[in-house]
A protein has these predicted regions:
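Structured, active/binding-site neighborhoods that engage oxygen-rich ligands
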Residues: 1-213
């Protein structure tokens, strides 16, 4: 059963809160551990977005050398409609192949000029170097130029993946889906305070769209 199917089979209760997800492994990353953080309304495609986030979280861990996705994981990802395609897998393969050259130039990467998938790769490279806090420094560069950044699913998935692999996902992380399809990261204190210079704020996430085109 694919990741998306597993997630789709996870029922929600009457309040729209996702019940505990089966312990599906993405590489060595547990979807259950990633997704028990989610609080979702009942009218959103939770399974699709969840599978998408899980992929990028696992991808970040793979690039950082923390985990390695299995052949079954790759097969599931390529079969999941609109979550990713072979072009992205090929591009990721090139990134992993040339990881050393990318890492060597990471300090000068113009992150804002990269598309969301490329930003995820760049942040994963930061996170794989030296200390767990390096990926946070990379993201802070985006904040310096864009005080109200819109986080895409791959970008947030990467951040969660590196955070999960090296420090653990904060228990205060809560996500809810708005009627317009955007996602708000609400009061994720351990993360948001670092991102916003100590202030509790809401970060808007754009979960889908153009990066797959």
């Amino acid at each position: 059963m694919t990741i998306a199917n597993q997630l789709a089979s996870s029922a929600k209760n009457d309040n729209g809160i996702m019940r505990r997800i089966p312990d599906v492994m993405v590489g060595h990353v547990s979807c259950r551990e990633l997704m028990t953080c989610l609080e979702a309304s009942t009218d959103q495609p939770v399974a699709v977005i969840s599978a998408e986030w899980s992929f990028y979280a696992a991808l970040s861990l793979s690039i950082a050398g923390i985990s390695k996705p299995t052949a079954q994981d790759y097969a599931s990802w390529t079969q999941t409609k609109d979550v990713l395609n072979h072009e992205i897998l090929d591009w990721v393969g090139q990134c992993v192949k040339h990881r050393k050259s990318l890492a060597a130039t990471r300090d000068s990467l113009p992150l804002l000029s990269l598309n969301p998938v490329e930003q995820s790769i760049a942040l994963a490279l930061y996170g794989s170097q030296s200390t767990p806090g390096n990926w946070m420094l990379a993201f802070s560069r985006i904040l310096q130029v864009s005080p109200q950044p819109k986080l895409t699913a791959p970008l947030l998935g990467c951040l969660l993946g590196v955070q999960f692999g090296q420090q653990g996902i904060p228990s205060s992380l809560r996500v809810h889906y708005q009627a317009d399809g955007k996602i708000c990261l609400v009061k994720a204190r351990r993360l948001v305070k670092l991102w916003s210079g100590g202030q509790d704020e809401t970060l808007v996430v754009s979960p889908r769209r153009s990066y797959l085109n």
